[in-house]
Amino acid sequence: MERRRSLNLMKFLRGISTTLLLFLAGTGSLNAEEIGIGVLNGTVATEAAFLNAQPGTLAQEGETWNFITPTAAAKTSATGLKTVRGTATQASISFNNPGYCFSNGTFAADKNRDYLLMDSWAGIRGTENVVISQLPDSMAEYCHVEIYGDCNTTDRDMLYTVNGMVKTIQDRENFSGTFNEGANKVTLRYVPVVNGVITITGNGADSTRSAINAVRLISPAPGIISFTATPPEIMEGSAAGAELSWKTWKCGEVTLNTKDGENIPVTTENGTGAITVNPEQTTTYVLNARGEDGTKSTAEVTVSYTHLRAHETPEHL
């Protein structure tokens, strides 16, 4: 009986340790500073209507959102943006000459706050842009940027370039209450911030405009910025192999292993590292990083391996 109690106690303690580890791994996101910005156009989508509506999955209970009503072919700015916790900042936003400002008419009294945020939009293309400046210190180097876009048509590809990083929304339907990556929102992780500024541009000058309904900025936790394999595929008999390269931010420990558990010694200096691998079969590599604050992040890349047929050499392919 005493042995059974001891075993149960050990299982209980292991459960506590596992739970604690998972909790500590997520503390970076819990402490993140966020700024939410919504566009208001038309007569129905108003700040008062937002406050009276039920919370949604994007605009959650108790969160503070900043609103701006852009004017077509003009510069419209808002200053003193607040975080979702209601803390005032020096951040500001400027819609610079959007060519089109519209309300989709999807918001009504029985809809939640997500519908209001997706109701109104400003369209940008060419030199028209959105500039968010004087970001808080937590976003001084990098920032996660979420852009929510839903125009008044159901067949538009909308490009977004944010400080050199690019994502596309393929808008194929009106907002129906669910957010889907690539369909009505895009997420750009670890966007490099330039002198406290984030600049968003849309489609090219000869194309239709990219819609901006809402933008959310999130201060990032320490983690992996990028992890790539070049080339992603190697052939049997190739001596060059593939180069794995990575970039991390504020991480004190970085390790590399294959998905089946083989450890690969690596060195990371100033947040960057690289190593050449030459697997003899398709192999997935796992990069693990521990941030200075204890947060953990993981990224994977796969190097595909192609077997040659008889009488072939790599030069024949």
Residue ranges with predicted function:
Residues 232-240:
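Short, solvent-exposed loop/linker segments at the N-terminal edge
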Residues 247-253:
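Short proline/glycine-enriched turn/loop motifs at strand-loop junctions of beta-rich domains
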Residues 264-271:
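Short beta-strand segments within Ig-like beta-sandwich modules, predominantly Fibronectin type-III
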Residues 271-284:
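Solvent-exposed segments in extracellular or luminal domains encompassing
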Residues 290-294:
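Short, solvent-exposed loop/turn segments at the edges of extracellular beta-sandwich modules
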Residues 32-221:
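Compositionally biased, intrinsically disordered or flexible polar/acidic segments
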Residues 222-229, 308-309:
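Proline-enriched interdomain boundary motifs that mark the N-terminal boundary
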Residues 306-315:
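Conserved small/polar residues in nucleotide/adenosyl-binding loops
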